[in-house]
């Protein structure tokens, strides 16, 4: 039996097995084996070229993928926000290649990818879906682009991403596995875990762990535990935009918001836009900035003063050392200390080391050996 047939057989058995406490361990093993087989198939297809794909060279400080079914307005949106020139049409399958555009915002260069419109079954390869989804996996943020008239597409889009191991708006499970030489599998938990020991051990054995110490924090489900021991899961934040709001009647607004709630999206979190009329785009840009966690660092350059025109862009939580690494050159090996003025400093020109955590709009001066 080939990998694809094996996967189909496992999926069928899982679907036909009722889930309860007595079948939990069995289903856990089946799901773990399914994840393992899918990972092997993914590696096999990648190794054989996978049918061309959509190789996109990433540029800028962050990459954002616009995800939506055909003709929801992704091309119009990227053209309105960037200097891209994506063909726009009022019919499906207009975008045949990935069209990157660069958004300049608050001194940052944010690459937006207008990927070909997804169709149902993309994760299974329909419409070049696997190649498209592989591009999305490399992004820092995914934006779901929905039509105001087809809110139900959100569930289908989220499912396609989940099926290729993209986990949006989720933290990786806290699962640590350390191999050992003998004595089987020991399970250590924080006291909250509802899965029994047989289920946990069965999942780990399917993953190839025979002798290991596993530490699990929290109370992950079977699926989350499997995520925690797999290497091919990708975690990223997401935003939901609702396009074409210029075309709706005022009386339809309540229906649209109810539809969002029905599909698990708070209307307060959704961003309502009209790409055609360029409405709501400032709100979208600000929300993107926050979701990406970008911050601006103004460099104090010797003899030239503080450069506020072209800030160094790093991520929230990053340190002086991260800034030094991004600056490149010989600065890393010549580094002595740094001085910081701004939100992260206790006072102006505070002397700090490499591990000092920077904040948005800090002024940084690196003192280096000659």
Swiss-Prot record:
Q: Name one GO biological process term.
A: cytoplasmic translation
Q: Provide any one GO MF term from the record.
A: GTP binding
Provide the alphabetized UniProt keywords. GTP-binding, Nucleotide-binding
> Has UniProt tagged this entry with the keyword Glycosyltransferase?
no
For binding GTP, which residues are annotated in this chain's numbering? Answer: 68-75, 114-118, 243-246
Report domain OBG-type G positions. Answer: 62-293
Report which superkingdom the organism of origin falls in: Archaea
User: Per its UniProt record, what InterPro entries does this chain match?
Assistant: Beta-grasp_dom_sf, DRG, G_OBG, GTP-bd, GTP-binding_2, GTP1-OBG_CS, P-loop_NTPase, Small_GTP-bd
Keyword GTP-binding in the entry? The reply is yes
Domain annotation TGS: ranges: 293-368
Instruction: Mention any Pfam family matching this sequence.
Output: MMR_HSR1
An example of a Gene Ontology cellular component annotation for this protein is: cytoplasm
NCBIfam families according to UniProt:
small_GTP
What family is reported?
A: Belongs to the TRAFAC class OBG-HflX-like GTPase superfamily. OBG GTPase family.
Protein name, entry field: Uncharacterized GTP-binding protein VNG_1111G
């Amino acid at each position: 039996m080939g990998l694809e047939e094996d996967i189909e057989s496992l999926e069928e058995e899982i679907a036909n097995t009722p889930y309860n406490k007595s079948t939990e361990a069995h289903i856990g093993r089946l799901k773990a084996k399914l994840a393992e087989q899918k990972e092997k198939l993914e590696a096999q297809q990648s190794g054989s070229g996978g049918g061309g794909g959509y190789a996109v060279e990433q540029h800028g400080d962050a990459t954002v993928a616009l995800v939506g079914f055909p003709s929801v307005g992704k091309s119009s949106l990227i053209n309105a926000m960037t200097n891209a020139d994506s063909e726009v049409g009022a019919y499906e399958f207009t975008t045949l290649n990935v069209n990157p555009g660069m958004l300049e915002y608050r001194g940052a260069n944010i690459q937006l990818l207008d990927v070909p419109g997804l169709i149902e079954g993309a994760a299974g390869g329909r419409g070049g879906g696997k190649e498209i989804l592989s591009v999305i996996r490399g992004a820092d943020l995914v934006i779901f682009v929905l039509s105001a008239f087809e809110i139900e597409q959100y569930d289908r889009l989220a499912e396609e991403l989940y099926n290729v191991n993209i986990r949006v708006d989720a933290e990786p499970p806290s699962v640590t596995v350390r191999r050992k030489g003998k004595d089987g599998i020991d399970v250590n938990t924080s006291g909250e875990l509802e899965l029994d020991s047989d289920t946990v051990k069965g999942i780990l054995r399917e993953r190839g762990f025979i002798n290991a110490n596993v530490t699990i924090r929290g109370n992950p489900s079977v699926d989350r535990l499997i995520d925690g021991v797999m290497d091919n899961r990708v975690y990223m934040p997401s935003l939901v935009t609702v396009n074409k709001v210029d075309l709706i009647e005022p009386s339809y607004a309540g229906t649209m918001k109810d539809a969002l709630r029905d599909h698990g999206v708070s209307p307060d979190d959704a961003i309502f836009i009209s790409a055609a009329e360029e409405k709501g785009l400032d709100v979208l840009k600000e929300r993107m900035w926050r979701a990406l966690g970008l911050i601006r660092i103004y460099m104090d350059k010797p003899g030239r003063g503080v450069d506020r025109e072209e800030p160094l862009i790093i991520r929230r939580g990053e340190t002086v050392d991260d800034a030094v690494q991004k600056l490149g050159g010989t600065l890393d090996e010549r580094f002595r200390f740094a001085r910081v003025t701004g939100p992260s400093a206790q006072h102006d020109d505070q002397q700090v080391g490499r591990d000092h955590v920077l904040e948005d709009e800090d002024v940084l001066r690196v003192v280096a050996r000659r």
